[in-house]
C-alpha cells in the first residue's frame, strides 16, 4: 500500500522539480522507477544469502526502515538527479515482500501454508490497487512532498510492527552441496515448466511496469491544463 502510492505521483514530482516537457518527465520517471528494480535484481541474491544465514525477520526490519528513510529523503530533494540517486539506494535496501513470502512459508504449519500465502497475496494485491488511488488523492490534498513523508512514516510503522510482533524460530541450515544446473534439472521434474513460468512472469512485468512511469504524463497531456486533482485521476 505504502509503496504503490508513489506510482501516480512520481512523474508529477519531477514536474515540480523543474522538468517541464512530457518527454523529459517520462525519461526521468522511467530512470527513477527502473533504477530501483535494476538494483533489486542485482542485490537480491546477496540479501537472500544474508537471510539464509541470519533469518528473514532481519531482512524485513532492514527493508522497512531503509525504505522509510529513502522516501523521507526524496521528499526534500530539489533536483531530479537527487531523486534518481535515492531511488538507486532504495533498490539496495528493498526486499520486504520476498522476505515476507519466505518467512511465512518457513514458519507456517505445512497444512496452513497455502492459506497464509494466499492471504498475503490478497493483502499485497489490495494494497497495490488501493495505494495509487489514495496516493493520488493525498498528493492533491496535502502535496506530493508530504505524500512522500507519509509513505516514509508508513514504512517505518511496518518496520516497528515487524520488530515487535514477528517472531521467527530460525535455525541456520547446515551447509549443503551446491547443485549444478544439470543436477538441479534432475531434482525438479517440472524444471522447464518453471522456466516457462518465469519467462511469462518477466514479460508480464515488462508490460505492466513500462506503463507506470508514463501514465501520469499521458493523462496530463490529454486533460485541460487547469484540471484539478490530476494525481488522483492518474491514480484511479
Walk through the language-model features, giving the residues of each.
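Residue-level signature of mid-helix packing/kink "hotspots" within the transmembrane helices
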Residues: 37-45, 95, 128-129
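Cytoplasmic helix-loop-helix junction between adjacent transmembrane helices
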Residues: 86-124
Amino acid at each position: 500500500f505504502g509503496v504503490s502510492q508513489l506510482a501516480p505521483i512520481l512523474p508529477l514530482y519531477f514536474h515540480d522539480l523543474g522538468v517541464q516537457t512530457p518527454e523529459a518527465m517520462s525519461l526521468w520517471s522511467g530512470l527513477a522507477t527502473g533504477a530501483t528494480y535494476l538494483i533489486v535484481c542485482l542485490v537480491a541474491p546477496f540479501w537472500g544469502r544474508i537471510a539464509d544465514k541470519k533469518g528473514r525477520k532481519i531482512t524485513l526490519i532492514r527493508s522497512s526502515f531503509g525504505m522509510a528513510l529513502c522516501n523521507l529523503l526524496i521528499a526534500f530533494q530539489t533536483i531530479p538527479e537527487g531523486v534518481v540517486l535515492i531511488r538507486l539506494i532504495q533498490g539496495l535496501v528493498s526486499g520486504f515482500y520476498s522476505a515476507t513470502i519466505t518467512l511465512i512459508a518457513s514458519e507456517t504449519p505445512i497444512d496452513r501454508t497455502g492459506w497464509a500465502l494466499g492471504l498475503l497475496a490478497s493483502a499485497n494485491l489490495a494494497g497495490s490497487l488501493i495505494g495509487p488511488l489514495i496516493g493520488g488523492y493525498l498528493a492533491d490534498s496535502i502535496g506530493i512532498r508530504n505524500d512522500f513523508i507519509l509513505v516514509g512514516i508508513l514504512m517505518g510503522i511496518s518496520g516497528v510492527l515487524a520488530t515487535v510482533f514477528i517472531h521467527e524460530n530460525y535455525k541456520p541450515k547446515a551447509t549443503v552441496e551446491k547443485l549444478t544446473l544439470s543436477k538441479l534439472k534432475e531434482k525438479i521434474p517440472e524444471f522447464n515448466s518453471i522456466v516457462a513460468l518465469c519467462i511469462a512472469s518477466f514479460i508480464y512485468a515488462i508490460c505492466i511496469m513500462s506503463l507506470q512511469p508514463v501514465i501520469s504524463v499521458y493523462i496530463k497531456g490529454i486533460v485541460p491544463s487547469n484540471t484539478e486533482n490530476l494525481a488522483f485521476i492518474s491514480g484511479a
